[in-house]
Amino acid sequence: MSVASFLTGEKLLAGSKFVIGKYNVTIEKYIAEGGFSHVYLVQTNSKTDGSPITAVLKRMYSPDENALRFVKTEIETMELLKSNPHVVSYIDSCIFPLEKAGVNTGFEILLLMEYCAGGGLIDFMNQRLQTRLSEHEVLKIISDIVQGVASLHYLRPPLIHRDLKVENVLLSFNTFKLCDFGSVTEPMHAAENSSEIQALEKSINTFTTYQYRAPEMINLYSGLGIDEKSDMWALGVLLYKLCYYTTPFETQGPNAILTASYSFPPFPPYSHSLKNVIIALLQPNPCLRPNIFQLMCEICRLRGTALPFRDIYSGRESSFYDLHNRKIMSLLRQTTTTPFAGNQVMPTPQVQGSRPPPPPPMPAPIYNVPNVPTVPTVSPNPFLQPTFSGTSQASAHPSIHSQSATFNNTQDVNRQSVSSPKVVSSSSVTGSGASGRKVYTPQSKNPFPISQGVTGTSSKFSASEVTEDNGSPNAGLDADNVDVEEVVNQRYPDLNELESQLTSHTNITTSSHHNPREQEIAKLADDAFASFRQTAGTSTANSTHTTGTQDISAFDTNFSEGVGSVRSSFDFPDRPVSRRPSSTSRSSVKITGPSSPNARSMAYEQHSFNLDDLSNTNFGSNNSLRHAKSFSKYYSPSHKDSNKTSRNTSKEGLPSSPTMLYRTTSNTRGDYIVQRTQQSANPLTNIEPQDMSNLSTDINASDVVADSTNSILYPTSTASSVANTIASDVDDFGTFNGLQRTVSLHSERASLDKKRPSFHDKNPYFKFSPSKYVDEGLEGESELRERVRSYANRSSSSFHNPDLTDTEIQETSFNNDLRPVASIQSAETSRSVSDRPANFPEELNDTLFEQKYPGIVDYEEPNSNAEKNVNI
């Protein structure tokens, strides 16, 4: 084969035969081509046993030895990862030199690999062009891809793919596999001079795709190395494209990538949990992006599956939400700090109004790891080189404050710009201790304080240090074969180190002279830390955790009952609520309703009950901690139009309310049954619905209408969330990383007026600490209790609904058996509705009645002299 025929696109004919290693190959058909490669479907027969195999032949061309080196890297990488089920399997390969007139003109490489009958991921996405991918499918695809990327990141030294995109993912028997390892390389240090920058820029332009490049690949003067976190950014872009069939920066320039300026389209709708993963991955600061294990933890939590591999990043938490909090606080620091001179030391900030720093994390235990030689410590920052060693690792960390002082103010609260490196300090950073002091000399300036000790050619590990029993390099994901765990504190900042950046801030709520940017930043900072406190369900002795079960987050829980369920967790401190499984925790409250044929035939999905005066409740000192923007209306697109979706049910005798509070179903008798499902572990999101079956008075539809201002509040999702069959009610509740990005500061939340908080708004900025709530209760609780008691103790004369006319309600009274009966008369029909069947024998006592008809309570005469016991 000549070079000219290869470069002019001449393809191999069907039936052509080759010998590649130990396989006889016959060309069947041409599949696709790349820049310097052709792909064919072939049939192979092993020379040893003659077994036929359908495979793929990738025919590549390299003009010189330097280009051949990258092809060999691809072959060696595939051979190293051939046991991973989420990587396209390597079969065999061979290299032929090409000559013309006795002169070497390049090399031809034949790579034989696994055939994926499902085609490419891009073909699978095109088949769903109209309906798009469901959230379950998106999580399945990204889970397989992450496991393939983890096989690279878990090698020692780690490898980065550099060209992660949907075009490099194939489908084989319901498994998505990673392919095209021609861009694989080891982590690279930041370029320090113009020649290195030019060489790095050429390499990036050759081996990466522009829309998937991380900010550190765009701004080569930022002083940031290119490592595994660059792959994490590409995974965020890939995940975004799986959801919305476009990249987040498709129509924007490089500045959009540098500042992570993008938005989420309204269609298709996905849960906030999935959007949070995208937001965490697309962070301009590599420190704030999760590592591959943290990403896998979040995906497994959303899917409800077990982790497929262990955590080698010792000393770090699996949740990256706390790291995202640091970004919010760094934005706050930009407006509260002033620039420092080059030789001036930044004072240590005093944190006020926030939680104290957590204790230092304990090192993760290492099980079944043999004794290994001690690995010499290296500098925690690749851009600061030690002159000699001798201090502890804790004292080796340079000051993080001076490094982060070069952050630039941006025009958007959800953006961080990558600036050119600036001189922070001309003095050296020294460690502590009288002897064995380690002195660091700044080599290059980094606007993001990423501590990375394993970059380029690894200073900690070599390929020979971690091997299999047969002498081959270890693939990295087998827990039993990991001999050395990485000390991640040498590579990335510790959580305590990041939290030390927090600066003091005052109560912005009572100040009116702050500009809109400061108000928005303060609100985000307050809400981020107030929303993620320890939940009440896990902070008490009653909390349990079963090994092997899904860890349900109190702020993002997918209930098995799905959309249409009533979520309840308003547990008053003095009355413990028993936690039962969802199959047994269902209770119903019978409400006698309108008896018209329309009412019986209609499928009432929602009823509107409102508690207007609940918003007038004084919430005490917690109210002063909230910014004015925290009182805004629905912040997410799935809730902002709930006022427009309210069903007008006034013609059926039910009030029209702007808030959809809970859903009911109608049985054959025309009764509306309010169903409760399993209680949520989060007391912030919902109020515990009252068990109306324990009240000492029955409730009918007219009473609810008459006393709508004293009704109990049942939060639920809106009609727009019902349309999304993927996202549950809890997924619609936004966490702090659910703050959706916009292209300008003038977001939808900034334009809303201040309003009092209410539970049914499902306000994501509701700021009561779960632990404080359980210990002290909620202010205004006594008023709620008294209101329920007064409702239960009303006399029969108070059962009158002023909203219904005399022609609609003829009378409301109690019969001799003290059974509430509401006679509702209309032009169409008139019938009497009772809570007991019409043929119920009167000689049966209450006990037999309750046994035969569970859930229907026979009420007794209200006694004004006796105190009513009402369970709240």
UniProtKB/Swiss-Prot annotation:
Modified residues (Phosphoserine): 472, 596, 657
Binding of ATP, residues: 31-39, 58
This enzyme's EC code(s): 2.7.11.1
Compositionally biased residues, Polar residues: 384-416, 452-473
Active site as annotated: 163
Catalytic activities: L-seryl-[protein] + ATP = O-phospho-L-seryl-[protein] + ADP + H(+); L-threonyl-[protein] + ATP = O-phospho-L-threonyl-[protein] + ADP + H(+)
Domain Protein kinase: residue ranges: 25-310
Pfam family, one: Pkinase
Main localization category: cytoplasm
Compositional bias segments (type: Low complexity): 365-382, 417-436, 579-589
UniProt-listed GO biological process terms: actin cortical patch assembly; actin filament organization; regulation of clathrin-dependent endocytosis; signaling
Identification of the protein by name: Serine/threonine-protein kinase ppk29
GO cellular component: actin cortical patch; cytoplasm; cytosol
GO molecular function: ATP binding; protein serine kinase activity; protein serine/threonine kinase activity
First-level EC class: transferase
Residue segments, region Disordered: 339-479, 565-600, 633-664
InterPro entries (UniProt xref): Kinase-like_dom_sf (IPR011009), Prot_kinase_dom (IPR000719), Ser/Thr_kinase_AS (IPR008271)
Location of this chain's protein in the cell: Cytoplasm
Keywords tagged on the record: ATP-binding, Cytoplasm, Kinase, Nucleotide-binding, Phosphoprotein, Serine/threonine-protein kinase, Transferase
Superkingdom of the source species: Eukaryota
Biased composition (Pro residues): 355-364
Family: Belongs to the protein kinase superfamily. Ser/Thr protein kinase family.
Organism the protein comes from: Schizosaccharomyces pombe (strain 972 / ATCC 24843)
Stored SUPFAM superfamilies: Protein kinase-like (PK-like)
